[in-house]
């Protein structure tokens, strides 16, 4: 009898597990830093080249992120299975479940651009209200619109990020449908909200410092955090 399809059930882990995820991410990087740096350089070059194209490039980049994310997870899987990773693994998502991974990118892009549109409406409304109100009071109205827009973006981005955090891994490794994978990813993030918050804080701080030396820190940050996210996926969904 064929095994039951993967349902995306997740488990709750200790908040301190995020530190072990980071440790595992660092350990994966040390196994083969050359391949990791090569993969990261190639990824950054591709994304920067795509993003140069006005509007279309930004949309395309959002659609391709899940495919490249699956490729990074493929590198992680090879390392965890004591296999030799290759730079070509970055494109594994283009060969398996590519259409489903693109749909994850579509839903992600719709969410992000939808939030950006709402923020634009708030900012433009605040500026218009400021012009109508007058100089001093108008500045306060405009500033209030900008602050409200920023808060809205922060709050509404969280569920979208949660829904796409594990979706590429669930689609790529378990052939889940995009919507089901995003629901499972969101549920896992909500169930482990404290661990994810701590992990997110480390990511934001690390990203800040990684961008200081002309972004060179990304050559270390992206591999380590890819490994850490893979480790968290194994911990939360596979119990290993």
Segments (PLM) and residue ranges:
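Hydrophobic alpha-helical membrane segments
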Residues: 1-240
């Amino acid at each position: 009898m064929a095994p039951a399809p993967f349902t995306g059930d997740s488990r709750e882990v200790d908040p301190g597990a995020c530190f072990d995820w980071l440790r595992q991410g660092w350990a994966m990087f040390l196994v083969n830093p050359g391949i990791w740096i090569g993969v990261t350089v190639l990824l950054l070059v591709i994304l920067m080249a795509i993003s140069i194209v006005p509007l279309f490039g930004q949309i395309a980049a959002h659609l391709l992120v899940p495919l490249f994310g699956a490729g990074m997870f493929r590198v992680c899987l090879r390392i965890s299975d004591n296999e030799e990773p290759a730079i070509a693994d970055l494109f594994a998502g283009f060969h398996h479940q590519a259409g489903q991974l693109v749909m994850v990118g579509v839903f992600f892009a719709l969410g992000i651009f939808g939030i950006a549109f709402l923020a634009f409406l708030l900012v433009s409304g605040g500026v218009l209200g400021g012009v109508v109100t007058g100089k001093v009071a108008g500045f306060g109205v405009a500033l209030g619109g900008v602050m409200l827009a920023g808060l809205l973006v922060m709050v509404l981005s969280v569920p979208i990020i949660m829904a796409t955090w594990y979706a590429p891994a669930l689609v790529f490794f378990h052939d889940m449908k995009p919507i089901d994978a995003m629901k499972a990813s969101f549920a896992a993030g909500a169930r482990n909200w404290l661990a994810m918050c701590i992990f997110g804080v480390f990511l934001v701080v690390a990203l800040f410092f990684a961008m200081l030396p002309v972004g060179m820190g990304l050559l270390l940050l992206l591999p380590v955090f890819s490994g850490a996210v893979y480790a968290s996926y194994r911990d939360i969904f596979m119990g290993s």
